[in-house]
Design a protein with these regions (language model features):
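Structured core of small recognition/catalytic domains
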Residues: 181-270
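Sec-exported extracytoplasmic/periplasmic mature domains
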Residues: 50, 54, 103, 112-116, ...
Length: 319
């Protein structure tokens, strides 16, 4: 509720087309850095990403008990999937989403000038990159990352990217959103994300809004709801999308791997509302990993929906 009140207060103080601070220029936001999930069994989830999907794990971080606490699954030199071996919190399996910038410190100043709560300073994380977090209107944790030349990420540049991995690119991350306008104020008006598509499965109410980062091709998918799913069901909504050139070939590759015998769920290829071929897989905790082609089935853009946003039981923080 505090998150809701804070963002409603910000909405009252800014015009619809807001340039933050007037003098503080927004640094570049270049793309999705990673998406982080809580996992109940780290070894099983590692097997899902490594044995079934073909990714590698260049490094991990240990907890106070000496056991692995966070595993880093590498998609490419700039994008990772982070697995937290910790109990899930109020947002289901979602820990946080992250975007990378060319200047984290200036981004902190920029966000602060617009009334967004930020830390007092920008420090280096355990892997050596500048980073800090903010909260969006729905209570999702959003990390801002600036890659550093002496970081673990830089150390692994050009490495641990096998040809057999199922994808080379995280196209988007998707998160549940209960009230569209506060999210648009943060992601569109403050962070500069550009809306490029709206989708509706029924034609009566809006389901998705796609927002591209201002200085790259990756995007954020806002997953609108009228009734908030319980935490154990949010893994199908809060999701990560891996781009593949041919979904049917990708599924055939997965089906041919020995690890497929351990993955008992069916993998179906279908055409989404956005008219792109896609297939969904689910990790051991039910978090959805979407495989999707970059183009529509006929090369023509899918029309954007004009359906209204749902009237939701919105509660800031997704409690």
């Amino acid at each position: 509720m505090r998150s809701t009140i804070k963002w409603l207060a910000i909405l009252l103080l800014i015009p619809a087309r807001w340039t933050v601070g007037g003098e503080v220029k927004r640094p570049k936001i270049l793309g999705v850095a990673h998406m982080a999930f809580y996992v109940s069994d780290l070894q099983k989830t590692r097997a899902f990403y490594k044995d079934l999907l073909g990714f590698e794990e260049p490094f991990s971080l240990k907890g106070k008990n000496g056991a692995d606490r966070i595993a880093f699954i590498k998609v490419n030199d700039y994008q990772y999937i982070e697995l937290f071996a910790e109990p899930a919190k109020q947002d289901g399996q979602l820990n946080h989403i992250a975007f990378y910038t060319d200047d984290a410190r200036k981004m902190r100043e920029y966000l602060s000038s617009g009334g967004v709560a930020v830390p007092d300073t920008v420090g280096k994380g355990q892997t050596g990159n500048f980073n800090y977090t903010i909260k969006d209107p729905d209570g999702h944790t959003v990390e801002i990352v600036e890659y550093q030349p002496d970081s673990w990420t830089a150390r692994e540049k050009g490495k641990r990217m096998p040809e057999g991995r199922i994808s080379t690119h995280i196209a988007h991350v998707g998160v549940l959103v209960g009230s569209l306008e506060p999210s648009m104020k943060l992601y569109r008006d403050i962070l500069g994300f550009g809306e490029f598509w709206r989708g509706s499965s029924s034609g009566r109410v809006l389901d998705w809004v796609n927002m591209r980062v201002p200085d790259g091709e990756d995007y954020l998918e806002l997953m609108l709801y009228s009734k908030l799913p319980p935490p154990e069901k949010r893994g199908g909504k809060n999701h990560l999308c891996l781009m593949v050139p041919d979904v049917e070939k990708a599924v055939a590759t997965i089906n041919a791997r020995p690890a497929r015998k351990e993955y008992v769920k069916p993998i179906e290829v279908r055409v989404g509302t956005n008219r792109k071929r896609q297939a969904n897989l689910f990790d051991p905790d039910g978090t959805r990993i979407e495989l999707m082609e970059p183009k529509t089935i006929d090369g023509k853009p899918a029309p954007s929906s004009t359906a209204p946003a749902p009237s939701s039981e919105y509660r800031g923080g997704l409690k």
